[in-house]
Amino acid sequence: MRNNIKENILELIQTLYEAHSNAEALIKEKDNQSVCALLEDCQNAAIHIGESIEQSEGENFITVKYLEAYCELLYTTSVNISNGIYEKIKENLNAQLHVIEDSVRDDIKGKWEIVFLPYKVSMWDSLESIWKRAFEDDDFDTYVVPIPYYDRNPDRTFGEYHYEGKLFPADVPITHYEDYNFAERMPDAIFIHNPYDLGNLVTSVEPKFYSNILKNYTNLLIYIPYFLFPKEPQTHLIDTFALENVDSIFVQMKK
């Protein structure tokens, strides 16, 4: 399961704890109708959590079983409330929810989704070693998404279109840039090696892949230069458009 989905589930579980407290307050006000409606909302939330877990872990996963038991408890609780039985409602619901929370934390393995955005295959070696380590690690789902670029005309308009996705080594699984939906997937990290955005006078990547746009789709935008840095910092090497938007820079220094 993606780490961000796992975190969303844990956040939703916290809202269920709050709902249990709200239900207890409504019981004290003898508002049984509102209590039962709130418990139904809890059941719908639990079903949503279960569906998310089933998609990644399978329908027989242990956490799903705990959620099913929670839904049964919610139903029984609603029936009891309708019959005027209010004993240990919050305590019982919280106990079962705690079992679910522990299972989400301990039984569901979170995975990081990382996207690499090379544009020229000749510069792939700057990203390749990091990609390879992540690709071979079960904690990561990796996507190599080569992005198109254009030559610049003398007037700085876009000239010839280039896409080099078919030129990469055969052992590198390639995802076409039109097949990866950044807004839906929201990767945990994006790696780029072109920091210039609209500032390059010779070429330009497709504008929708400029760093200020990519930043909207991840919490960690990382720039890896495709050259070795000199021992003494050079201003022209670090003063580029993308550096206003990236979260980290990985560099290799000349010895």
Show which residues each predicted segment covers.
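Non-catalytic N-terminal targeting/anchoring module and adjacent flexible stem/linker
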Residues: M1-Y119, E136, I147-Y149
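Active-site and donor-binding regions of nucleotide-sugar-utilizing enzymes
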Residues: W112-K255
